[in-house]
Amino acid sequence: MSATGDRHPTQGDQEAPVSQEGAQAEAAGAGNQEGGDSGPDSSDMVPAAEVVGVAGPVEGLGEEEGEQAAGLAAVPQGGSAEEDSDIGPATEEEEEEEEGNEAANFDLAVATRRYPAAGIGFVFLYLVHSLLRRLYHNDHIQIANRHLSRLMVGPHAAVPNLWDNPPLLLLSQRLGAGAAAPEGEGLGLIQEAASVQEAASVPEPAVPADLAEMAREPAEEAADEKPPEEAAEEKLTEEATEEPAAEEPTSEEAVAPEEVTKSQPEKWDEEAQDAAGEEEKEQEKEKDVENKVKNSKGT
């Protein structure tokens, strides 16, 4: 390789105008030497020194232009490198973010595919909780005891019985409205009236009208249940009454049952009178004893 080939192209550009201008100046100087004495126009010719002096600034301008061209050529290369260095990391970060987003979306998609009913359990539990809460706070579902429910029921207003006389009214109305109807329809109306009467004859359940009656029922039940002592006394009295009845003659045993039922109250009255007389006698005896004691103390 030659030495000229290794040189930078910008340096060749800078030296090219200088060599051309030097050649022109030498040619002009040679012309002046040849024709300096020949004609009157020799004074108008520019000396070689002046041409060289002019060529100096021209060479300086050429060097400056070459440096500017080299700078302009170098600046795009450096700027492009810096821009590439700045753009490179930004693009890499964006690509990483996109890859991360894609991975997250893929995970979500996989989760939804693997567990499609993940949120149904929470919804079902919330629904069951709300239903149980409503059932717990609903007063119409509470079950009370029998006696409490009977006491809590208030007096019912007397409901008018619409089934007292509607069959006759229906018969009169229907027969009056269907006077022009054929005989077969009249028989059907009579059968319907009979069925309505049978439905009306069904007894209705008795409903207590007052709370007082409802409260008396437990008291009556308690009164019916007598204590064992009273039951034993009643048995003794019955046995005592049965013994004299057994000692009576057989003629009285043949008495009709009506007479026996009539004589039993009389016997009970006599026994009560005897018991009262005995009590009075005992009281009189006690009074006599007290009087005797007082008299003895007074003496």
Swiss-Prot record:
The entry's keywords: Coiled coil
Recorded coiled-coil stretches: 270-298
Keyword Zinc-finger: no
Pfam family, one: CT47
Biased composition (Acidic residues): 81-101, 239-251, 268-281
Record has Coiled coil as a keyword: yes
Bias (Low complexity) ranges: 20-31, 46-60
Annotated segments matching region Disordered: 1-102, 215-299
Residue spans of biased composition, Basic and acidic residues class: 1-10, 215-238, 282-293
Family listed: Belongs to the CT47 family.
Protein name per the record: Cancer/testis antigen family 47 member B1
Classification lineage: Eukaryota, Metazoa, Chordata, Craniata, Vertebrata
Designated gene of the protein: CT47B1
